A protein has these predicted regions:
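Typically disulfide-stabilized, N-glycosylated extracellular/lumenal ectodomains of secreted
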Residues: 2-332
């Protein structure tokens, strides 16, 4: 039984404990704290236990828990991570972008996106920006990201996967499209505004089930906007990351102003079917720990694995879910 010598565990009852019993209790607590510290140290070193045994658990400062992994036989199919040298930057194989963080509990991965731009569009035209493919077990999180466009006389669109080519006119049908418009004239620029509501900057929700995306720009040079705002920008980023400033509408290289690209949150699943169907996968069933459970994800087809109530760790590894101590429950 764990003993916690704190108000959290005992309240003011310590005032009524005899001196001898109190000293014994304090001694027992010190011994327990020593053993707990040692255990915590082992668990800290064993954050490597979140990786597959014998495999690297980090690339730079980013922890790489299984089913992700670095090197042969260290990852589940579709979750390979490259660790670039000498910078030690983890690269997610499915998108080819830097990996910032992996969250096992929520089934999320933060990657570094880029900012698409189109400059000096002198007539009504559509320009394609840079695209990022997000494949197989990954999807752009609709609840954790937002689509942003910056510029004057700009309409930006974000399109999902190309589903069907249209033979008659050479066009395509996309899985989903979101758009927002940004209009600003030089004489009404307010250098104090930080609002992203359509004057120089606009934001909108992204389409559902977005696995790959391509930014488009429509610019019709309204009121000679090209003279003072030559470029239009668009990007998907983690909600709350971006703060608009009016100077961005006149920038000719917004990416350089931020140094690195915006963070983008991906949802990932262990499989694309349902929990019921996944249990027929046999040896390839990913929730292999005895104290794990399968959970159908709410935001699209697929499932992921969680440790059962009272356990924590990595449900994708045998023995990966460990029992939580009584003190851990009290702290939570």
């Amino acid at each position: 039984m764990a003993i916690c010598l704190s108000d959290t565990c005992f309240g003011h009852t310590l005032l009524f404990i005899g001196k001898t019993k109190l000293l014994l209790l304090m001694a027992a607590t010190l011994i327990l704290q020593h053993s707990t510290t040692a255990a915590d140290g082992a668990a800290g070193a064993g954050n490597s236990s979140l990786a597959k045994p014998g495999c690297r658990d980090k690339c730079g400062n980013v922890s790489i828990p299984y089913p992700f992994g670095i090197g042969k036989d260290c990852f589940r199919e579709g979750f390979e991570v490259y660790c670039s040298t000498p910078d030690k930057v983890p690269i997610l194989n499915t998108s080819g972008t830097p990996l910032l963080e992996i969250n096992l509990n929520f089934g999320e991965a933060r990657i570094q996106n880029n900012i698409s731009q189109a400059c000096n569009i002198t007539k009504f035209n559509m320009v394609l920006g840079a695209s990022i493919p997000v494949q197989r077990f990954f999807m752009v999180s609709r609840t954790r990201n937002i689509f942003t466009a910056i510029g004057c006389s700009t309409i930006a669109l974000i399109a999902g996967e190309i589903q069907t080519p249209i033979e008659e006119d050479g066009g395509f049908i996309f899985d989903g499209i979101s758009a927002c418009g940004s209009f600003y004239t030089e004489d009404i620029i307010d250098n104090t505004t930080k609002d992203c509501s359509g004057r120089g900057c606009c934001q909108t929700a992204i389409p559902r089930n977005l696995k790959s995306f391509i930014p488009f720009f429509l610019n019709n040079s309204l009121l000679g906007a090209q003279i003072f705002s030559p470029c239009s920008y668009a990007f998907i980023a983690e909600t709350g990351w971006f703060a608009f400033h009016p100077s961005y509408v006149t920038s000719q290289n917004l990416q350089n102003q931020f140094g690195f690209g915006p963070p983008l949150v991906l949802d990932w699943v262990a499989g694309n079917g349902s929990c019921e169907a996944s249990r027929k996968m046999g040896s390839s069933y990913p929730c292999i720990d005895a104290n794990s459970e399968c959970v159908d994800v709410p935001n699209g087809p697929g499932f992921r694995c969680n440790c059962s109530t009272g356990y924590e760790g990595n449900p994708y590894l045998a023995g990966g879910c460990r029992g939580q101590s009584a003190c851990t429950h009290l702290r939570n």
